[in-house]
Amino acid sequence: MAGWSRIVLVGGLVALAAAEWHVGAAAQRSEVAPADQYVDPSAGPQFTEGREIYQQNCAGCHESGAGRAPLRFVLLQLAPRAIREALTNGAMRLQGSGLSPAQKTAVAEYLTATKSSAEPPAPPPYRRCTGAAARFDFAQPPAYDGIGLNPSGDHAMPDRVAGLSPDQVGKLRLKWAFAVPDATRLRSQPALAGGALTFGGSTGEVFSLDRETGCLRWMFKASAEVRTAVLVEHWRAGDAKAHPLAWFGDITGNMFALDAVSGRLRWKRRVTDHPAAGISATPALYKGVLYVPTSSLEEASAADPHYPCCTFRGAVIALDGKTGRTLWKRWTVGEPKPLGASANDTTKFGPSGVAVWNTPSVDVKRGQLIFATGNTYSAPADAMPPWSNAVVALDLKTGRERWHNQLTQGDLWNYGCIVKVAKVNCPGEGGPDFDFGAHTVVAHTARGDVVLAGQKSGVAYGLDPANGKVLWQTRLGRGGATGGIHFGLAARDGTAFVPVNDIPDPNVNGFPISPGLYALDAATGARRWAAPASETTCAGRPRPECMPGLGAGVSTTSRLVLTGAADGHLRIYDAANGKVLWDMDTWRGFDGLGGIDGRGGSIAGAPAPVLWQGELFVASGYGFANRQPGNVMLAFTAR
């Protein structure tokens, strides 16, 4: 490929690095690179300062594989400017707060084995739209409502909108690829409105592309990585005087409202004051109100034995979409208070945590907002309200609790539990880290509505929407800190579709590791079919970044189920029996538009594939939790 691409600049070093960069890597060595052939590309004296900073501040997590911290081979694939951005405004901003700009540059150069003076030039400008492609189409209001595609969050696409039948699946072909330079992941499900495809990226930009050609209509620079989908306000089809807004959040806790036509900023609001707080999950949008869930990176800060752990607490905030004004705010746990000193004479705080990693679903019939929560970061385990690892329902208008059901008790966990030098920050023995990462779904069945929830423990639940009582629970996988039911759920015509991301986890035993896609009776939890993950697609590819598990969002029509996997494969299944009808390997290079080439990688995170009139859109690349990086938005067509 002749175009610009930093993600593959180091070429074969990527596969080699996977063999040796972390503690215990012998068990994970790539079959393509014998260890005795590996030479550390950043071992030279020109990287001494950065190496020392890294060893003192970063190695504890990045060389032990602690939690979701990316291993060295992932960091090696980045450009220095991407590391600097992460330390300044991104996921590592707290860890980077004590470093000077020169120190950030030094560690960025060491981690990427690239001196800034030798850094590749900025990419060529994106191909801008002209003529008809640049015009906003007021005849096309949003095709779907948010990341869940409708208020209930069931990821069901109407057949008339999707426009793809089983007999057309085999006709799908790549139409265009849009690459985002320096990005390592795309975790933003694209919005379809006004003839545009709009999404965010890990480098902090939001892009609005012409859906037909992939050219750039506008681009907006946010404060940090955008992991949420972009929500576009509805308007009456054909109303050329409409001024729809486009909303999204970034991982530093800012909500933005843009003019959906031009990309100009209308308002910006930081929804929480905690320095580690962010917005990872897409807000729910209903009748002009944004319901914003907050999560946090603070559990990673606990890997520092001198960090005063922990003070973040999750929340859901209701905002007026037009103005950003707060309508109500509901904390998920009580206010943290000092709890004495640790063995390092550092003040401890608690309770804390209970982040909301998933998009709430709207139970329109009962006027309630339903979401699931994460674990507690610090004691006490019985903090009030007992909402950790729970499914919670709030009144849509007031935020008052309707009901809650805590499905795993006593799950206190932070990175101090897996970094030896930081054990002083681990609460007790440390819990299993069984968050609810997947969004809830209000599923409609012949027996009535059921709230679906999926946990990292590998268990799927059906709850009564009236009171939260468990109607059924079905174990599908072994589960683990990065396994089990990780992000996506879908439901259609009384069937729940559940992806399982099981990977080997030394802390979890018992049930067999069972990655794959499962169909359950949404009313009873009975298994209808199972489609185990492929055991062959990772052959010849380095571990651990290639795993066959399914940890991405799922979408469905009446006859099709679509989802991606950590092995980079995008698959379409027969909804009736789980048979794979179409399989596209995206773990490869792509000729990007405008000479900006890119690569696909793992498909993971909350975004799901989206269909519109026989065209399929999906992001590939998930440089997180040691999955394969990538930087492309792909468009396929069966027309």
Predicted regions and their residues:
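Repeat-blade elements of multi-bladed beta-propeller folds
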Residues: P141-L149, A183-E205, A224-M255, G278-P308, ...
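Blade/loop signatures of beta-propeller domains
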Residues: P124-L174, K337
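A structural motif specific to WD40 beta-propellers
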Residues: R173-K175, C215-W218, R264-K268, L327-W328, ...
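Beta-propeller blade signature
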Residues: L258, F312-R325, P386-R400, I513-G525, ...
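Surface-exposed loop and turn segments in beta-propeller and other repeat-based domains
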Residues: A179-V180, R270-D273, K329-G350, R402-G431, ...
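Electrostatic cytochrome c docking/interface patches
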Residues: Q28-I53, P124-P125, T130-A133
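Extracytoplasmic electron-transfer domains, predominantly the class I c-type cytochrome c fold
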Residues: Q28, D40, A69-S117, Q368
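The canonical Cys-X-X-Cys-His
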Residues: G50-G65, I83, V107
